[in-house]
Amino acid sequence: MFERIVDGRTDLVFEFLAQGHPANSADDDGVSLIKWCAYYGDVSAIRFLLANGESLESLGENLGLNGAAFHGHWRLCQFLIESGADVNRPLLDTGETPLHAAVCKANRPTYSLVLKVLLANGANPNCVTKASAETSAFMRDARTKAETPLHRAAAFGTEEAIQLLLDAGAKLDAKDMNGDSPLSWASWHLRPDSILRKLCYGGFAIHPGRQATFDHGVGWGALEASLLGTPHV
């Protein structure tokens, strides 16, 4: 039965404990039931384990809030915050906060809900990571760049996610370790003009006639549309 829980049937924790297994049971790799339930965002299963003797601290640093944000589990984020997790606590090795963790995936609407929960509970939109610290947020051979959450949202987030950060006071002119702004990150990642416009600051602007819709290289860009020409028939 544990294998089925590992594969997503976290509802089976009720039956698993009813069979006499302890709430702090773990698989052969030492990953506990509560961590699997957190991985899948099952707050009800977590509450059941807690009621039967498991400890929320076993989820790790800051009650695992960064992980919950990274996986897009807004309900779990809210529960962990209500249980004492700190929305502004950075990871010791990278300086990444839960806000940073919530803007690591491209165009996933669920992360806007996570941002809403974090920001509503006082998350600082202008916190920065450490410089050149190896991060697992992007899985392979990646290092932080002293960036804000808006930098990451500019590269990967939806328009809504970007607007949420801006409304919370995120700085358009924030610079990372290389002197790049969120607009720089959006430009490098080939974001659409609608996003670039949101991120313009100072003397930067996007021509009102530009309506490039490509995102991360997918779709039509302004140059490609222009190169089509206009047939005179």
Give the predicted meaning of each segment:
Residues 1, 26-33, 58-66, 90-103, ...:
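Ankyrin-repeat boundary/"N-cap" motif
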